[in-house]
Amino acid sequence: DFVRLVKGISFKEALAFLSEEPFQKETVQEKRERPFYYPLKRIEDSHCSLARYYLTECRGISEEIVQKMIQQGLIVQASWKTNETVEPVIVFKSFNHRHKLQAASLQGIYKNHSLPRERLKTILKGSHGHVGISFDIGKPNRLVFCESFIDLMSYYELHQQSLTDVRLVSMEGLKRSVVAYQTLRLIAEENQRLEFLDTVIPSKLLPLINTIRDTTSYFDNHPDLLTLAVDCDDAGKDFSDKLSQSGFPVFLDFPDNKSGKEKVDWNDVLREKKSDLQLMIENAKETLRNQPVRKTSQCLEL
């Protein structure tokens, strides 16, 4: 089925191909994952008022983009209990190729100075981390990978005029398994063979994408398939370098780091751009207020 998917050939032709080609054996550990259980459904807040406020006012993302993500079911607001404290959180949802919920990441709204990053950040237990959180623009024929969903929304807002027929994917970290799954998903969609993905377990994702690289010309024929829009830091660069050195054609789209900071992500770029724009507007208003008032005098019409 895998050979038929990638090469678009018949069953007999696939058998002939497998009998002729010398393949390197790989040891794959079989591990069936349990279905993901989502415990927050009954305590979701459909209004998402606090989530909207945090994403627009604190993160600088436009109301229009936040609304799109809410409408597609990728963002909801819920309550989360930590020890004896209940707090509102934003839930970012991950759906697979059958639009079944596979994972959920939580983002705290209120600051908590006892936490390392000041706000709650966690992934729900039992999440299938190989899927990622995806958002489609048009009919996707290429993939753009970000580290977080907030970065994904920021990247979308900054580039929306030039983004067509693309799937934006949040890896929720730096996960090669997400790159493998989403690549196989795109190939399966192109060949109308989504049923193939139903049979693939997570431990087979990397061996399968490596086989495509080694035995087909798929990546040669699709040089613009993969874009990494990860953070501009040591971890992001290391992840990108390793993927490129593995023989995959990868276009690198790091956020600008003109100030030479240790880490810059796409949300940093978005907020800085909006801050600069706001400063320009305030300066223009101040200039207009300080302009001298024109004196007018009456004249007689002859």
Residue ranges of predicted features:
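TOPRIM fold recognition
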Residues: 159-302
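Short active-site loop/helix that positions an aromatic residue
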Residues: 5, 152-160
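Non-catalytic accessory segments of DNA primases and related replication-initiation nucleases
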Residues: 1-58
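Short, glycine-/Ser/Thr-/acidic-enriched flexible segments
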Residues: 97, 150, 233-234
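Basic, glycine-enriched DNA-binding surface that flanks or lies within the catalytic cores of DNA
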Residues: 33-137, 161
